[in-house]
C-alpha cells in the first residue's frame, strides 16, 4: 500500500487527511526505520508494508466506528513503536493518549517521535502495566484501553480492565480469531466484572483477516487485581 493508496482509501471512508497529517505519517515512517537500526522496534520496515500493516492496521478502531475525534482518555498497553494509538492520534487529534511500556529505549523513541510530529496530549511512562494499574493516578481513569497483538484475552483482561472507568471499553486488536480464547477468558472477565460486547471481523486491503474484541467494564475492579508483575502471565485467572 503506497502512501497515496493509503490516503485514497481513507478518503473513500470519509477521512480526508490534511497535508500536515500526511507529513506526520511520512515522518513517522522515517523515524521508525531510522530508530529500528538502533533498537528493535519492528520486523516490518518496507514503506508500503509499514503503511498497510502498521498505519492502516492501527486505525482500524476509527474505521470500524469504535473511536472518533473527541476528547477521550485512551491508554495503549504494549504499544511498542506506538501502535495502534499514535496513528489514531494523528487522525483524531482530540484524543488524549497515554502509553505504558516496559522498555525505556522504546519510551525514548516515542517521546522523540511525539515531539517531531508535534503531537500534544500524549504521555509516556516506563514500567509494568501491573504496577501502574495499582496507582490511583492511573486506575479507573481511562475511557478506552487499546492493545494490539499483546496477549491472550485471559491475560490481557487482567492487565487492562483495572485502568478503565466503569462503562469504559477495552479494544483488543488481533490477527486471529480463536473462539476458544474468549471461552478461556470467561472466568477472568467475570472476576473483573467485564463483558465481551462485540467481536468484529474485517480484512486489510490485501485480504489479511483482522479482529477487534470489544470488552466493556461493568463494575469497579476488585482491589486485588491486577496481581503482582508477572503473575497474570504465569497463572492466568
From Swiss-Prot:
Compartments reported by the entry: Cytoplasm
Annotated positions binding S-adenosyl-L-methionine: 78, 83, 129-130, 148
Enzyme class: transferase
Coiled coil: none
Region (Disordered): 218-237
Main location group: cytoplasm
Gene3D superfamilies noted in UniProt: Vaccinia Virus protein VP39
A GO MF label: rRNA (guanine-N7-)-methyltransferase activity
CDD domains cross-referenced by the UniProt entry: AdoMet_MTases
Keyword Transferase assigned: yes
Cross-referenced Pfam families: GidB
GO terms under cellular component: cytosol
Organism domain of life: Bacteria
InterPro entries attached to this UniProt entry: rRNA_ssu_MeTfrase_G, SAM-dependent_MTases_sf
UniProt keywords, alphabetically: Cytoplasm, Methyltransferase, rRNA processing, S-adenosyl-L-methionine, Transferase
EC number(s) from the headed UniProt entry: 2.1.1.-
Membership in a protein family: Belongs to the methyltransferase superfamily. RNA methyltransferase RsmG family.
General function of this protein: Specifically methylates the N7 position of a guanine in 16S rRNA.
Protein name: Ribosomal RNA small subunit methyltransferase G
Record organism: Streptococcus sanguinis (strain SK36)
Amino acid at each position: 500500500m503506497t502512501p497515496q493508496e493509503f490516503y485514497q482509501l481513507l478518503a473513500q471512508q470519509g477521512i480526508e487527511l490534511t497535508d500536515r497529517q500526511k507529513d506526520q505519517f511520512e515522518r513517522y515512517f522515517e523515524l521508525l526505520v531510522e530508530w529500528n537500526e538502533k533498537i528493535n522496534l519492528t520486523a516490518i520496515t518496507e514503506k508500503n508494508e509499514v503503511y498497510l500493516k502498521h498505519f492502516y492496521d492501527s486505525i482500524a478502531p476509527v474505521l470500524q466506528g469504535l473511536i472518533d475525534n473527541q476528547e477521550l482518555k485512551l491508554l495503549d498497553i504494549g504499544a511498542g513503536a506506538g501502535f495502534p494509538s499514535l496513528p489514531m492520534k494523528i487522525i483524531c487529534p482530540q484524543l488524549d493518549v497515554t502509553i505504558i511500556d516496559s522498555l525505556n529505549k522504546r519510551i525514548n523513541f516515542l517521546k522523540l517521535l511525539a515531539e517531531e510530529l508535534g503531537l500534544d496530549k500524549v504521555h509516556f511512562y516506563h514500567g509494568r502495566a501491573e504496577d501502574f494499574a495499582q496507582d490511583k493516578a492511573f486506575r479507573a481513569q481511562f475511557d478506552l484501553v487499546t492493545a494490539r497483538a499483546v496477549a491472550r484475552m485471559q491475560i490481557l483482561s487482567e492487565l487492562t480492565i483495572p485502568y478503565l472507568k466503569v462503562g469504559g471499553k477495552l479494544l483488543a486488536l488481533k490477527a486471529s480469531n480463536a473462539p476458544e480464547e474468549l471461552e478461556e477468558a470467561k472466568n477472568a472477565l467475570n472476576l473483573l466484572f467485564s463483558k465481551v460486547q462485540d467481536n468484529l471481523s474485517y480484512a486489510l486491503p490485501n485480504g489479511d483477516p483482522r479482529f477487534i474484541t470489544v470488552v466493556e467494564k461493568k463494575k469497579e475492579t476488585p482491589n486485588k487485581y491486577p496481581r503482582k508483575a508477572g503473575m497474570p502471565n504465569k497463572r492466568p485467572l
